[in-house]
Amino acid sequence: MARYIGPTCKLSRREGTDLQLKSGSRALESKCKVETVPGVHGARRGRLSEYGLQLREKQKVRRMYGILEKQFRNYYKSAARLKGATGENLLQLLESRLDNVVYRAGFGSTRAEARQLVGHKGILVNGATVNIPSYQVKAGDVVSIREKAKKQLRVQSALELSKGRAPIHWIEVDSTKLEATYKALPERADLSAEINENLIVELYSK
């Protein structure tokens, strides 16, 4: 399956919630009416079956993190092999992706932009260049921006936007050195309450 490159607003409208696919430079409501589904004007959201709810939740999380279907299923399989709650393990694996850590640290205004920054060799992990967006960042790893990438306008813009975000305690950001330390895996309570990972577990458990 190819990566989606169409309007990101359409995806948020499909899921009925902000998937954090836009930069946040303006309020989402001014750019994207998430309360209406894409397609026919004024169409209402139909009542979903149990399977439909599970599928929509999986699609929502997959699109939020920018993961392809096969990748997402593999993350689920890995999460199921770990000790603890499979749903929470899944979210922790997704949060530990390098592109997501770059986004959370404020080095990219969206996860897609952070993914590009990683892919274009603009990111270092413990001083070494890593250009694999899915790279799993471990506790204690230091993620930083390469010197030549620090001057990029998109990086400067992302850093400015990040000042308005609530601090994330599992990632410690040094705004002077432009580096972030991944202190620990996030707890479930730290992550979005709008995600119901149990629905995803139910879907894949069938």
Curated annotation (Swiss-Prot):
Q: SUPFAM superfamilies annotated for this entry?
A: Alpha-L RNA-binding motif
Question: Pfam families from the xrefs?
Answer: Ribosomal_S4 (PF00163), S4 (PF01479)
Looking at the keywords, is RNA-binding present? yes
Domain S4 RNA-binding, residue spans? 96-158
Q: Is Transcription tagged as a keyword?
A: no
> Would you say which domain of life the source belongs to?
Bacteria
Q: Which InterPro entries match?
A: Ribosomal_uS4, Ribosomal_uS4_bac-type, Ribosomal_uS4_CS, Ribosomal_uS4_N, S4_RNA-bd, S4_RNA-bd_sf
Tell me which CDD domains the record gives: S4
PROSITE patterns from the UniProt entry: RIBOSOMAL_S4, S4
Give UniProt keywords alphabetically: Ribonucleoprotein, Ribosomal protein, RNA-binding, rRNA-binding
Q: Name one GO cellular component term.
A: small ribosomal subunit
Per the UniProt entry, what is one GO biological process? Answer: translation
Q: What does the record give under GO molecular function?
A: rRNA binding; structural constituent of ribosome
HAMAP family (UniProt xref): Ribosomal_uS4_B
What family is this? Belongs to the universal ribosomal protein uS4 family.
What does it do? One of the primary rRNA binding proteins, it binds directly to 16S rRNA where it nucleates assembly of the body of the 30S subunit.
Subunit text: Part of the 30S ribosomal subunit. Contacts protein S5. The interaction surface between S4 and S5 is involved in control of translational fidelity.
What is the name of the protein in this document?
A: Small ribosomal subunit protein uS4
Lineage of the source organism? Bacteria, Pseudomonadati, Pseudomonadota, Gammaproteobacteria, Oceanospirillales
Please name the gene that encodes this protein. rpsD
